[in-house]
Amino acid sequence: RDKNGVGLVKEDLNYLSYLIDWTHANSMEFHVTELNYWLNNENPKSISVQKRQVISYNNVVNTLISKKNNGVVTLNIWGLFDRKGPGDFPKNILSLYDQNGNPKQSLYAIKKSLINESTSLIFEK
């Protein structure tokens, strides 16, 4: 798996798409239950990290939207606020709001995708 996140790797998104199709073909629902963005040793406030989070969330959500007419798809966010990992984990866990409760670009990207029913994916070189 790429260190930057599943939503940034075409092969991972293709596999997600395949899993959703398989689930629907077998008369089951598909649920993403813990979407968040984990970081090791990177500044969670850096522009590059924020941009990767937006693209990753955009791609996961848009993949789900592309499958909505084939069966049930759902998305749950694991925590609303950016936070440190539990225990001795040296990581930051990013979500839709910063630690002060301010909405982040990832929230606006998800809202835009849902409103526009977007299915396009973004891949950077």
Task: Tell where the protein language model's regions lie, with residue ranges.
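Aromatic-rich peripheral "rim/lid" segments of glycoside hydrolase catalytic domains that contact
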Residues: 3-125
